[in-house]
């Protein structure tokens, strides 16, 4: 059984499909600059909202065609900082697309998970609207 993860970021909305052993099967990236609206105006324009909805509906169609039963839509900084993200989420819910906006701390925790087995190392995630840094020093995550 395959699983799909959709990353709704500040500069692009991308998906990755993994097989049951979490090997990457497919990757797709569509540049859609949510951060352009959010970081300059504080909210998403109507046209941008419509683009997001259309794109996520097309992703959902792909997942159904590929018989992917488990998929997750995750949003980060742009929707976290957006004054009208609730409007977008409500419009998506009507279409059975449930988006989870994760906190910066959650992003950092995910990095920590990636980095936990590599002592004396650092992982840096430079996104369009935030930066998360995870340091593993003497097997302690910071």
Region locations from a protein language model:
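Nucleotide/phosphate-binding catalytic cleft detector across ATP-hydrolyzing
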Residues: 1-10, 16-123, 134-142
């Amino acid at each position: 059984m395959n699983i799909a993860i959709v990353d709704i970021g500040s500069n692009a909305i991308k998906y990755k499909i993994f097989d049951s052993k979490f090997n990457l099967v497919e990757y797709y990236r569509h540049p859609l600059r949510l951060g352009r609206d959010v970081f300059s105006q504080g909210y998403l324009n109507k046209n941008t909202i419509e683009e997001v909805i259309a794109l996520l509906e097309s992703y959902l169609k792909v997942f159904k065609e590929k018989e992917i039963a488990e998929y997750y839509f995750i949003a980060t900084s742009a929707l976290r900082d957006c004054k009208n993200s609730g409007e977008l989420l409500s419009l998506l819910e009507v279409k059975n697309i449930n988006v989870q906006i994760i906190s910066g701390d959650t992003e950092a925790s995910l990095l920590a998970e990636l980095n936990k087995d590599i002592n004396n190392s650092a992982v840096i995630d430079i996104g369009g609207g935030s930066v998360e840094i995870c340091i593993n020093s003497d097997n302690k995550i910071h």
